[in-house]
Amino acid sequence: VCVSGGDVYAAGSLQSGLTKPLAVVWKNDKAHYTLSDGETPAGVNALCLSGRTLYAAGHSGGAAAVWKDKELLYTLTDGSSYAEATAVCRFGHTLYTAGYHTDGFEEEGVVWKEGQELFDLSDGPGSGSMPYSVAVCYDDIFTAGTIFGTTRTAVVWHGDEIRYTLSDGTGHSEAYSMYVLSLIHI
């Protein structure tokens, strides 16, 4: 969800009857625009409003995708394995996206900068990862999500390193959101 003035934007997917899910952005209580053509399944997982430009992160045809307003901006993966963009943020003039692709039977978290893979979010072999939120402050990139091993463990990454483990690992936990207020560089 994004808010601008008195307008509320929401995004997700819409499926009617036997059609494939469409990636849709709503403005207030009406469909604002559709981002996909219905030929392949698509959906939006996150929005970022920068000035008057609305960015949407999601998937189309099994590939991670980012849209700028109504137009496809980046296809982040080649579609050879299922992938989704799960988070998007803009810092200055740079767009960052987090998401995942499947590697065999495991999800592997990734952060992209301007449509190019910047780094992956791994905890080593046998442990997948799933980012749900990304925030950037100057040169610091933070991602919140989950690593998979014997349990699901909520973590926050700083760059490609785990900064905080948010649970003790005895049960399942997932971090879905975060917010970076400010950083002081000394």
Where are these regions (language model features)?
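Recurrent small/Gly-Pro-centered beta-turn motifs in extracellular repeat architectures
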Residues: A11-L14, A56-S60, A98-H101, T143-I147
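Short loop/turn motifs that cap or connect beta-strands within the blades
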Residues: A31-P41, L73-S81, L118-S127, R163-H172
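Conserved small/polar residues in nucleotide/adenosyl-binding loops
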Residues: I184-I186
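Beta-propeller blade signature
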Residues: V24-K27, V66, V110-K113, V155-W157
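Structural motif
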Residues: L18-L22, G62-A63, F105-E108, T150-V155
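Repeated scaffold domains used in trafficking and secretory/extracellular systems
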Residues: V1, P41-C48, Y82-C89, G128-V136, ...
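Tandem-repeat architecture and repeat-register "anchor" residues
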Residues: V1-S4, A11, T34-L35, S50, ...
